[in-house]
Amino acid sequence: MNNIHDHKILILDFGSQYTQLIARRIREIGVYCELWAWDVSEEQIKEFAPNGIILAGGPESVTAKDSPRAPEYVFTAGVPVLGICYGMQTMSEQLGGKVIQGVGEGEFGYAQVELQTQSELFKSIEDAISDSGKPLLDVWMSHGDKVSEIPEGFVTVANTETCPYAAMANEEKKFYGVQFHPEVTHTRQGKRMLEHFALDICQCDANWKPASIIEDAIERLKQQIGDDEVILGLSGGVDSSVVAMLLHRAIGDKLTCVFVDNGLLRLNEAQQVMDMFGDHFGLNIVHVDAENRFLDAMAGEADPEAKRKIIGHVFVDIFDEESKKCVNAKWLAQGTIYPDVIESAGSATGKAHVIKSHHNVGGLPDDMEMGLVEPLRELFKDEVRKIGLELGLPYDMLYRHPFPGPGLGVRVLGEVKKEYCDLLRLADAIFIEELHKADLYNKVSQAFTVFLPVRSVGVMGDGRKYDWVVSLRAVETIDFMTAHWAHLPYDFLGRVSNRIINEIDGISRVVYDISGKPPATIEWE
């Protein structure tokens, strides 16, 4: 088997919102890469031994005195370097070129660049031909500053009407700079440019594939764990489910999964988890029915942050109790994924800001004397899903809309009661079922129902009823950082509303949330 980490790209992060996207694109090409902060040491780079380095974008201005710079070793390491946006500007400035501050003439959004010179990076790539017979590329720009003079040894590869150096290259040293963003889908041939860089220029083999990743993970788990036993908190979500399947393949019945039913799950979800992992896949699962314990702990509490913390604390207490019963367990498995690792590194340097407290299993007791097993910590979410498919998990489960860790605890507004959860479960199930029937489920990024703790008058037959209100929420988004409300057809919404009001005793009104993010968040709490 080829070592999936033999060939690799190092991406240095200067703070761009697109940096993780670069890493995901390189991984999609089949090449392993890691994302590090820009201020790494020469020793760290040497130890990582990348086949190529990408300098990502960032919000700073190269013209500012204290703006970040690439380590000098990047340009003497003898490996290809690709600078993207800010990365191109700092490369240019550090190698003797010049960058000028943009004054009212930056480029933001769609642009067309004209190729002036042949380059390995743009080999056989074009979107159109200019009047003068030169290749044109549709790209996505997002810059104020621009390179005004390229370093010695570089040639101009592409330009736009307002940007004389939209791409530059030193083919001898294999240094390349692009002012646009090849990692975003708006740059139509962007992935091919990154393929040229990773596969042709850096000479990486495309070994980073789901089957190889699984093989490598299982081998490493066997070496790490040996004959010991492992305990895993299985939620039925994507990450913990894939961890469970990997560990089951690696160590079989030496894995104990603890599934805590907190009473805040979707309709029939607890039974589905037990059926799939227990009956179908044959995993060793401890099912803890803790609905009353969670609801009792939250009684009278209406504050969303407080509810999240209570749910987290009760889970930790239960998991701690169950782990003590597994007297031979030496290892605790977690579904940590690569963005969690990046985020915690960011918060360690003070660059990350928490908007809502995270509800991962990261809050487990410090005094659990176990080693930590994190088989997904190198993987992005889309990679985890692909691995799940390869391991035999159903598509519908892996590509289901996101569900918050606290579950219905943050979809019942205010105080959480069993009655509210039961009504919400039924309403949400109808909404999701109708989305599937209308072939709309995969056309929206996330859809769910929210329980509002207010009563509204309704008319049923000859009588009036005074019952609860639910809100439907559906959004379209690429990255969940911003989102538009989904323009679902009126007749569809009418059908969902009719079914909820007619089939669920206790709900008298259905509303549809048409708030975007920002200013609203996707979840109500």
Curated annotation (Swiss-Prot):
Active site residues according to the UniProt entry: C85, H181, E183
Principal EC category: ligase
Annotated GO CC locations: cytosol
Record GO terms (molecular function): ATP binding; GMP synthase activity
Reaction(s) catalysed by this chain's protein: XMP + L-glutamine + ATP + H2O = GMP + L-glutamate + AMP + diphosphate + 2 H(+)
Residues reported in the UniProt entry to bind ATP: S235, G236, G237, V238, D239, S240, S241
Official protein name in the record: GMP synthase [glutamine-hydrolyzing]
Organism: Shewanella woodyi (strain ATCC 51908 / MS32)
